[in-house]
């Protein structure tokens, strides 16, 4: 049975719209759901997040919006530190209207999570510190600060322009990989696309994800395969090819190394 976390165990009253719940570090947590929404910002470390059956690696700068009806869990954690902004109900905001539009824009799309750069993360931290310092009865100030948090995240989402400093280009590149991992990747062409030296490309992906570029792409492909194995009736060989693997035997070996279970066993 999936555990359900209740708002009454976190919020001070039914009218309180948001509350901060830091996790430093986040512990392994089994699959669960809530009767409130949650905005999660990864501050440090790494781990695997499984949202509605779809696994995804976490690393600093990842942002995701989790709705009450979603079910998710954390595993394979390595000093993972999170800032969780719990949202009791959009209707509890007195001054912010239609905030669900902003929040829904931050909802993960399977392999693709939102990313913010280091400068934005530091600015958001300063806003959250102010929220923590203000009495919860000061609704206007708190809601203004929360709106600034959402606006900052929205303003620094992925584009594939190849503009900006090295960090901005690097994060654009990672988001591109998350949306195109099933394709054959030519790393020289990708480096040129995002105006990065090839060594910088390799170094940046390694520093952000903890994996070499090719290993990171393999993990993205395996995550998509995991989801399709659990929630579709597609043939295993077809899943392997659709996710970017050219050899089904190699796919099976990689899958078992990643999830400690063979693709066929996952379907039993």
Swiss-Prot record:
Entry's CDD domains? Answer: cupin_RhaR_RhaS-like_N
**Residues in HTH araC/xylS-type domain copies:** 171-268
The answer to keyword Transcription applying to this record is yes
The residues that make up the annotated DNA-binding region are 188-209, 236-259
GO terms under biological process = positive regulation of DNA-templated transcription; rhamnose metabolic process
Q: Note the site residues: Interaction with sigma-70.
A: 247
Compartmental location: Cytoplasm
> SUPFAM superfamilies given for it?
Homeodomain-like, RmlC-like cupins
User: Which InterPro entries does the UniProt record give?
Assistant: AraC-bd, Homeodomain-like_sf, HTH_AraC, RhaR_RhaS-like_N, RmlC-like_jellyroll, RmlC_Cupin_sf, Tscrpt_reg_AraC-type_HTH, Tscrpt_reg_HTH_RhaS
MF terms in GO: DNA-binding transcription factor activity; sequence-specific DNA binding
Q: Does the keyword Zinc apply?
A: no
Q: Which UniProt keywords apply?
A: Activator, Cytoplasm, DNA-binding, Repeat, Rhamnose metabolism, Transcription, Transcription regulation
Q: Which GO cellular component term is one of those annotated? A: cytoplasm
Q: What does this protein do?
A: Activates expression of the rhaBAD and rhaT operons.
Write down the NCBIfam families for this protein, in alphabetical order: PRK13503.1
**Family matches, as PANTHER family:** ARAC-FAMILY TRANSCRIPTIONAL REGULATOR, HTH-TYPE TRANSCRIPTIONAL ACTIVATOR RHAS
Subunit comment: Binds DNA as a dimer.
Q: Which HAMAP family match?
A: HTH_type_RhaS
Q: What is this protein called?
A: HTH-type transcriptional activator RhaS
């Amino acid at each position: 049975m999936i555990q359900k976390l209740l708002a009454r165990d976190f919020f001070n009253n039914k009218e309180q719209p948001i509350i901060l719940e830091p996790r430093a570090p986040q512990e392994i947590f089994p699959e669960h759901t809530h009767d409130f929404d949650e905005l999660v910002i990864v501050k440090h470390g790494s781990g695997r997040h499984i949202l509605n059956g779809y696994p995804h690696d976490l690393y600093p700068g990842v942002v995701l919006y989790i709705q009450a009806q979603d079910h998710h869990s954390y595993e394979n954690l390595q000093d993972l530190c999170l800032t969780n902004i719990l949202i009791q109900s959009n209707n509890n905001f007195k001054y912010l209207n239609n905030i669900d539009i902003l929040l829904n824009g931050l909802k993960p799309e399977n392999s693709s999570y939102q990313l913010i750069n280091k400068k934005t993360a530091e600015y958001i931290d300063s806003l959250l510190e102010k929220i923590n310092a203000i009495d919860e009865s000061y609704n206007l100030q708190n809601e203004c600060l929360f709106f600034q948090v959402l606006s900052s995240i929205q303003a620094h989402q992925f584009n594939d322009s190849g503009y900006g400093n090295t960090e901005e280009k690097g994060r654009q590149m990672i988001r591109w990989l998350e949306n195109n991992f099933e394709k054959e990747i030519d790393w020289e062409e990708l480096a040129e696309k995002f105006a990065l030296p090839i060594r910088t490309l390799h170094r940046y992906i390694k520093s952000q994800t903890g994996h070499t570029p090719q290993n990171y792409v393999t993990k993205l492909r395996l995550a998509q395969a995991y989801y399709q194995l659990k929630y579709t009736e597609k043939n295993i060989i077809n899943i392997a090819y659709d996710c970017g693997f050219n050899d089904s035997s190699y796919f099976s070996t990689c899958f078992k190394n990643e999830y400690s279970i063979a693709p066929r066993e996952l379907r039993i």
